[in-house]
């Protein structure tokens, strides 16, 4: 309990506003690299996921690729890319690693969102004369958006935690304070920086959870509400 109090005091100490890397700057850098990595991963994974979900081709390869990518050790991937690309490009190498780690969750969310759409909805859209492009843009993409945002949530949580590793390859992000705390055996600094990362991750997840709820089409919300109301009388009868 004493260590927790000391960690809170470390976070709000006046010294956090100055020094080698002020806490506010560390948070901004941590958040910036997270958003950059997720945005690049989304630019790659969303079109690929929509193509797989729309055509049904390449799903097995995508599942295998996503599974293999999730098994990659984050720390080894970051350090390996830094050594391969070069120490002069530490930021670029680190962001590349974060992008590779974020792609599987976004890819899965993109194609599973389209696959989850009921078949009669797709058949109805084709019956009214929609082209494949119109079907994707007007039907599949909007209905699959909640699962896509769910994939973005998973990717964001993974990346915001993994960006901490940048503290081992450079003086960036909140990982810098953790690495510095390990070197100085300053446990309040380690815990304080970790708590800030947790708060940042929870805030991002909560924001994306709200977005995920808002992107559910109104018709789907009404239908799910009607389904729940229909089930309740049946549940009462089964209970009696």
Predicted regions and their residues:
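Transmembrane alpha-helical segments of polytopic membrane transport and secretion proteins
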Residues: 1-2, 10, 21, 206-240
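Periplasmic/extracellular loop-to-transmembrane helix junction in inner-membrane transport proteins
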Residues: 1-38
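Loop-to-helix entry region at the N-terminal start of transmembrane alpha-helices
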Residues: 22-33, 82-105, 144-145, 189, ...
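Transmembrane alpha-helices
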Residues: 35, 133-165, 192, 197
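Membrane-embedded alpha-helices of multi-pass transport/permease systems
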Residues: 43-48, 92-96, 100-122, 145, ...
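Cytoplasmic-entry segments and transmembrane alpha-helices of multi-pass inner-membrane transporters
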Residues: 48-81, 98, 108-112, 123
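Short cytoplasmic-facing helical segments at TM-TM junctions of multi-pass membrane proteins
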Residues: 109-148, 174, 178
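Hydrophobic alpha-helical transmembrane segments of polytopic membrane proteins
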Residues: 174-211
